[in-house]
Amino acid sequence: MGTVLNKPVKVIGTNQHAALVALIRAERRNAGLRQIDVAKLLHEQQQWVALIERGQRRISVVEFLALAQAIGFDPAKALKKIAKIKN
């Protein structure tokens, strides 16, 4: 069983968060999509995608799944890669 933390879990600025952001950005570019294209597919503003890609916004699991579907990558494979990275 894991250790119970007595302080909030840091997300933004961790190695895993940086890798997740880089992966999303790379997958979007590989798909030939612009930030505005992804934003429109998800009924969001372009700034929402930009904040995620700059690592300035946390990403929920549901948002990650929506991004993966809109961009066209396998979220399970992506998370396996991210999970191997140590913070």
For each feature predicted by the language model, list its residue ranges.
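N-terminal flexible/basic segments that precede or flank functional cores
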Residues: 1-26, 30, 69, 74-80, ...
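Residues that mark the N-terminal boundary/hinge immediately upstream of a DNA-recognition element
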Residues: 23, 34, 60-63
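Residue-level detection of the helix-turn-helix DNA-binding "recognition helix"
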Residues: 29, 43, 54-56, 83
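Short alpha-helical DNA-recognition segment
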Residues: 32-51
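Charged, amphipathic alpha-helical coiled-coil/dimerization segments
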Residues: 36, 53, 69-72
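Short Asp/Glu-rich motifs
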Residues: 47, 58, 87
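Short, basic-rich loop-to-helix N-cap that marks the start of a DNA-contacting helix
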Residues: 56-68
